[in-house]
Design a protein with these regions (language model features):
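Structural helix-adjacent loops and short alpha-helical linkers that scaffold large soluble proteins
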Residues: 3-21, 101-116, 167-181, 220-233, ...
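Aromatic-rich carbohydrate-recognition surfaces in CAZymes
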Residues: 1-51, 262-277
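Membrane-embedded hairpin module used as a gating/binding unit in multi-pass transport
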Residues: 93-99
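Structural signature of alpha-solenoid helical repeat junctions
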Residues: 1, 12, 86-89, 110, ...
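Short, structured segments at the rim of ligand-binding sites
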Residues: 21, 120, 255
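Extended ligand-binding clefts on enzyme/binding-domain cores
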Residues: 24-91, 103-104, 112-211
Length: 283
């Protein structure tokens, strides 16, 4: 985080503390989305993924301890309201809020509340986001609390692939490794293999289009220098001669791509370059 990297406490004004309070209150309300939340989103004359069903409230959910999401990082509507990567990130962020509350604001009450909330979300994930009756335990992408699960991953961040990147667990965690194997395979309906590349795409873009951002994240979450280099080379070879990283490209025809300039993907690619170079120096 910025604070961990710089030690700069000046950014933590009273307004930021109020924002922390608003985050906790909002997420707690959305733990009970169906009964307590006033949020809805309705849009007409649009694809189904651009609006929420059930008169704007989304599909029904049961209480789990997780917090509800209407939309994914891709801006597509969730199928089931508990988006697991986002809840994992929320658990991490709540821990960060607790740390700042103690160290900067000297507010032990807020810190304890954030810590307890973080643990509640994590316990719900570890209890209810694991696919039942499988030989190995791995995480679903979305659940609804009624027993419905969605097995997939989306290139947009946060994702299941990126779990170690945002600090929910390390990349040696058994459930993460099991999940990684699933989402980097045909078990993920948005994993595509072609003549030029293979990787994770998104329902937000076309079939058989994969996202360089997911390739970069595959490298960033690997300990293998060989895999990191392979992802760098794959991204560079599929830039359609533009010297830029695109949103997505066709696995058979990389010159067929979306967004000629996608700064999010360019940034994650650059981070992988730095990560790879840094490790090479260490080695």
């Amino acid at each position: 985080s910025y604070y961990e990297a710089t030690g700069d406490e000046t950014v933590f004004s009273p307004e930021v503390k109020k924002a922390f309070r608003r985050i906790l209150d909002t997420w707690k309300t959305e733990q009970h989305h169906d009964n307590e939340s006033s949020y809805y989103f309705r849009r007409i004359n649009c694809p189904p993924t651009d609006t929420l069903s059930n008169d704007g409230k989304g599909e029904p959910t049961a209480y789990t301890g997780m917090t509800w999401s209407g939309f994914r990082p891709s801006d597509d509507a969730c199928v089931y309201g508990y988006l697991i990567p986002s809840n994992m990130l929320a658990s991490v962020i709540l821990g960060n809020i607790a740390e700042i509350a103690r160290e900067i604001y000297n507010d032990e009450k807020l810190a304890e509340e954030a810590d307890a909330f973080s643990e509640e979300v994590r316990n719900a994930i570890e209890t209810l986001a694991i696919l039942p009756a499988q030989k190995t335990e791995y995480y679903a992408y979305e659940v609804d609390g009624f027993g419905q699960y969605l097995v997939m991953d989306d290139a947009n961040l946060p994702s299941l692939l990126a779990i170690p990147y945002y600090g929910y667990c390390d990349n040696k965690n058994e459930r993460y490794q099991n999940t990684r194997k699933v989402i980097l395979s045909d078990q993920n309906p948005y994993y595509f293999s072609g003549e030029c590349a293979k990787g994770i795409g998104s329902p937000h873009t076309y079939t058989r289009f994969i996202w360089p951002m997911a390739l970069a994240m595959q490298g960033l979450t690997s300990d293998s220098m060989e895999e990191k280099l392979k992802m760098l080379e794959r991204i560079a070879a599929c830039d359609a001669g533009t010297d830029l990283v695109h949103e997505s490209f066709h696995v058979d025809h990389p010159d067929d791509f979306t967004r000629p300039w996608f700064s999010w993907a360019n940034s994650v690619f650059c981070e992988l370059v730095l990560d790879y170079c840094g490790q090479k120096v260490t080695l």
